[in-house]
Amino acid sequence: MAALPISDDYPARRAPVVTYLLIAANVVVYLITPVAALLTRYGVDTTRECAQVVFLFEWAAIPRELLSGHAIPLHELHDSIIPGPCLGQLTQFHKTVWLSPLYAMFLHGSWLHILGNMLYLYVFGTRVEDRMGHVRYLAAYLAFGYISAYGFALTDPDGVTPLVGASGAIAGVLGAYLLINPRGRVLGTIFYVIPIRMPAWVLLGSWFVLQWLSLEADSQGDSTAYAAHVYGFIAGMIVGLVLRRSRNAYGGGALFAWR
């Protein structure tokens, strides 16, 4: 089912400050990177494309690097990895590999990529942040991003394609929401056009099934990191389960005092 969320029926008790800040940070980072190519210093055509490629290899999470703990040496990069015209623009740089999943969470490949991610984060992050509190929500979000990145690396240990996007972290938010508020009503669109209100478990459950089936199909040429989505979602479900049990244990009151 091709569905996009628009809003849910949950009245938040506090302003989702962290969710808003995450959205703002993602948008700002996208606008100032070569991927958006809005700054004239990135040039046009081949120069711009090379700036994008070089930028991603310097900052994005790369499976092979994550598992080895070291950046790929320049002499191992060739035309099959980086387009020939761009190789000359690469210089040896110091890359802190363990931080690359953090950087990658704020990088996106296109306008559609970031808009879709931010829409899901806005709709579902508000509820999860309200339940967890600001600090723990941020910690969980970052943890989801790391888990999804390293999970993706385990499925493609020799991969050299840069992994970018907040999708893995947001998948964790979706998984947590599914356990926190499965019967919540979400306003969405079917096939991106037809508005419909449905239970959260229907929309999120179908989303996860779609990611799983796409992962199993392992479509050639598909640039979507389905494994990252699956790992992130499962991590989020575990957190959501803990939240539900904590709420039951303490009578449904305020879950955490952290803000």
Where are these regions (language model features)?
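A detector for small-residue-rich transmembrane helices and their helix-helix packing motifs
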Residues: M1-R259
